[in-house]
């Protein structure tokens, strides 16, 4: 069993660097940034490019996440995403990393973010 306090973690800046470094790669080789906050939180502010998979539906929908891609998990502060990181690692995913400090740290670092209503397809796991 994985302890949520001891899951692999990176800073928001490092997570963004990983995403940017893979920017030109085929979609199936790029890391996916998964936000586990609830929709009302996600619509207010989100890391640019994040896909939404709310914690409230995570147990039912986690199987939608690819097991052959790097996954970066994010939430508001890093607590919920640490729990989901631990869950995925305990259930067969091998390349899952928590974004320490979550969206709060992302914004404090001045990293790309979106605010307000979603564009069509924005936040979809398949986008």
List each language-model region with its residue ranges.
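Rhodanese-like catalytic fold shared by cysteine-dependent sulfurtransferases
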Residues: 1-32, 39-70, 79-127
């Amino acid at each position: 069993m994985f302890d949520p306090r001891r899951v692999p973690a990176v800073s928001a800046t490092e997570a963004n660097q990983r995403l940017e470094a893979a920017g030109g790669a085929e979609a199936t080789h790029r890391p996916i940034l998964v936000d586990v906050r609830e929709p009302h939180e996600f619509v207010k502010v989100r890391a640019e490019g994040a896909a939404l998979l709310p914690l409230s539906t995570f147990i039912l929908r986690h199987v939608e996440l690819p097991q052959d891609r790097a996954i970066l998990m994010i939430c508001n502060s890093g607590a919920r995403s640490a729990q989901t990181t631990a869950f995925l690692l305990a259930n067969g995913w091998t390349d899952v990393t928590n974004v320490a400090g979550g969206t709060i740290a992302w914004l404090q670092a001045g990293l790309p973010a979106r605010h307000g209503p979603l564009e069509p397809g924005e936040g979809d796991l398949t986008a």
